[in-house]
Amino acid sequence: MKILLRVTFPHKPFNAAVKEGKAGAKLNRILEAIKPESVYFTDHNGRRSAELVVEMSDASKIPSLAEPWFLEFEADVEVRVAMTPDDLKRGGLDELGKKWA
């Protein structure tokens, strides 16, 4: 299943990593470990952030996706399940609508 991972970095730890010349190496180490399908760096509520798409086979993998960000940057991590249009079709919305209408 596809997982959307939003990582939001607090200023102080990330700034320290930048000033020490370690931010790039830390980011690369994490990205090599979790192997996202795609990653975009942006901002979220005025803070540095990253949006990643990751394939995950079961929920027990969540710690391996989140802990590196917590431990390296003291970052906030949000995990959301994402569906393709085909996933949504297989979800049976029409039947659910009939059942719960």
Q: PLM features: what roles do these ranges have?
A:
Residues 1-101:
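Conserved, structured core segments of small domains
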